């Protein structure tokens, strides 16, 4: 069995010594852990929790400084409700939120926590958060095994990256998926009938983009058929992956091996290149995701956009959302990806694992999930809430995402790499940009990316 201390050292080696492991790989042994147990109500406990929006460590100050109804105010209000509600359940437990950033900054902070623990100190946090690297941590013994019966109401697909041999080593606070957003004004102006605004297949989406693009060119309009995300690195990969999966591929295959040049992926990349010929031109050179969303939602520069649900809560009336189209006319060939899937894991080195698990149980309850969906618009992970009629009245523009989330049929987030991650995503970005904007044979591009990225793993 893999001991926790051994597992934690392997994480440190993987992070600092650059031991090559792709996050899609399965562990050969399970972490050596047992049941967490129940909360000890006879001692004072401080839970140290890494946090990310909408959990705000400075929520009390924000409630005083921010205007009511703003995003920061709503996030602070959510945090206050969470703290107060948990206090009623466990009066002896104090919640201390620690904001360590996101992405590389977060991963670096977690490396330092692990280093200090290995040097003989205490683990600095009871609960770690993250997205891309959480599966790797779970596979290497960093997290304690949760009582899955306490989290039976959490959607399974969002937990896939931290599920090992049927056991859960983490749960998400909130999640997100990709969908197809569309501009009704542009589609109407281009002469597309309303019943055709929502394409059900790849071919129908491509045809609508062609019609809009040609209409815009003939009538001196500033928009294109689609706003496409070509931001280097992970942003473009998050939008491409649903199409790779719909074609039967992925960046890593089911064995965790690099598969960029697989036949399935080549087919998807060829389709994405076809879409790109009808894109709003400036979207293909834009290097900022927020600017792309601004192009689509505020400037009306595209009829369609492949994007997560986060902007839809405040979108204008002419911006609607729909599921991503299927690859095939018979409805087969569907794909998606969990994104903004904020995972929480209880560290195996924590001295307060029971209280930490109780916090995660409360965080994923339908009561708490309802608060932050109402206040922040992030997709909840509670099955009870997702399947309720009430949720459909809160943010109607997000309902298509909710229905897709409930329908399921997909799991897992973006493929990730522990060794040379920045180099790998830079190489991916160059490759994907060439897919969308160049005339070079895609198989040739994919073979080169396979070799270049493979050399970094």
Model-found features: residue ranges?
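Short, solvent-exposed loop/beta-turn-alpha elements that line the ligand-binding surface or hinge
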Residues: 144-154, 197-198, 224-231, 247-268, ...
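Long, aromatic- and glycine/proline-rich binding clefts that accommodate carbohydrate-like moieties
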Residues: 374-426, 430, 434
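Extracytoplasmic/periplasmic substrate-recognition and gating elements
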Residues: 88, 190, 277-278, 315-379, ...
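Short helix-initiation/N-cap motifs at beta->coil->alpha
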Residues: 99-112, 200-204, 283-297
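Glycine-centered hinge/linker elements that transmit conformational signals in sensory
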Residues: 206-211, 254-285
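Hinge/lid segment of periplasmic solute-binding proteins
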Residues: 34-41, 101, 107, 128-179, ...
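Conserved N-terminal structural module of periplasmic/extracytoplasmic solute-binding proteins
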Residues: 9, 20-133, 194, 354, ...
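Extracytoplasmic/periplasmic solute-binding protein
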Residues: 169-173, 178, 203-257, 302
């Amino acid at each position: 069995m893999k001991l926790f201390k051994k597992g934690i050292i392997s994480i440190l080696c993987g992070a600092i010594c650059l031991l090559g492991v792709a996050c899609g790989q399965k562990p050969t042994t399970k972490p050596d852990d047992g049941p967490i147990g129940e909360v000890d109500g006879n001692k004072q406990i401080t839970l140290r929790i890494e946090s990310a929006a909408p959990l705000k460590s400075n929520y009390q100050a924000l409630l005083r400084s921010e205007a009511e109804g703003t995003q920061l105010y709503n996030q602070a209000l959510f945090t206050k409700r969470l703290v107060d509600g948990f206090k009623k359940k466990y009066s002896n437990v104090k919640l201390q939120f620690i904001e360590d950033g996101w992405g590389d900054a977060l991963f670096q902070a977690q490396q330092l926590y692990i280093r200090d623990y290995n040097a003989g100190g205490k683990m600095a946090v009871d609960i770690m958060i993250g997205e891309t690297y959480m599966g790797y941590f779970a596979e290497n013994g960093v997290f304690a095994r949760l009582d899955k019966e306490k989290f039976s109401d959490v959607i399974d697909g969002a937990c896939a990256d931290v599920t090992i041999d049927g056991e859960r080593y983490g749960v998400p606070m909130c999640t997100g998926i990709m969908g197809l957003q569309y501009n009704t004004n542009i589609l109407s102006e281009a002469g597309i009938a309303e019943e055709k605004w929502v394409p059900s297949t790849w071919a129908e989406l491509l045809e609508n983009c062609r019609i809009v693009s040609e209409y815009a060119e003939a009538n001196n309009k500033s928009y294109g058929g689609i706003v496409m995300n070509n931001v280097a690195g992970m942003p473009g990969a998050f939008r491409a992956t649903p199409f790779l999966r719909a074609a039967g591929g992925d960046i890593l295959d089911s064995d965790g091996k690099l598969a960029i040049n697989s036949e399935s992926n080549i087919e998807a990349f060829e389709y994405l290149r076809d879409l790109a010929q009808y894109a709003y031109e400036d979207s293909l050179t834009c290097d900022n995701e927020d600017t792309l969303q601004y192009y689509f939602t505020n400037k009306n520069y595209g009829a369609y956009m492949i994007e997560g649900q986060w902007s839809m809560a405040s979108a204008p009336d002419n911006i609607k959302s729909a599921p991503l189209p299927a690859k095939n006319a018979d409805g087969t060939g569907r794909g998606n990806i969990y994104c903004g899937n904020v995972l929480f894991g209880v560290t195996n080195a924590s001295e307060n694992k029971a209280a930490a698990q109780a916090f995660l149980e409360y965080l994923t309850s339908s009561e708490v999930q309802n608060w932050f969906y109402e206040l922040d618009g992030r997709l909840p992970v509670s099955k009870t809430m997702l399947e309720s009629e009430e949720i459909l009245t809160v943010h109607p523009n997000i309902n298509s995402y909710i229905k897709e989330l409930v329908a399921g049929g997909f799991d897992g987030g973006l493929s990730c790499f522990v060794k040379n991650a920045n180099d790998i995503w830079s190489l991916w970005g160059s490759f994907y940009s060439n897919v969308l904007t160049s005339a070079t044979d895609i198989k040739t591009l994919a073979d080169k990316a396979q070799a270049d990225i493979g050399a970094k793993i």
